């Protein structure tokens, strides 16, 4: 994970830009300059597709935590009001056979899910939130996973 870090300064490095829809002006606004103290642990981490791929596998198979802690985090519960195939553990989302997590904040959204049976990982990063700050990363992940692994999806 050479290109992942916890942001401590306003703004993002390099040429990366993120956009959110402003319903008043009916235009996309650049949300790139953000104060990492605001999201803190909920969104100040910056990473790349190539770093998130091995992280998703380690998150779901272990190697980051002690075995007992990993076993506890893998226990999951159904989410109220959601289909039965969606479950949440301790910092993990289970979508049927897929294990991983997602996040959306300030013009950016990500999905990273690992499919243990196939040793496959799908990572989606999107730098735009659409109307009402809705992300397309979930929709993209659900579509790609259904095309590549139809036998492992419940959607």
Give names to the regions the model predicted.
Residues 1-18:
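Active-site helix/loop module of the DD-peptidase/beta-lactamase fold
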Residues 17-155:
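Catalytic loop of the DD-peptidase/beta-lactamase superfamily, centered on the K-T-G motif
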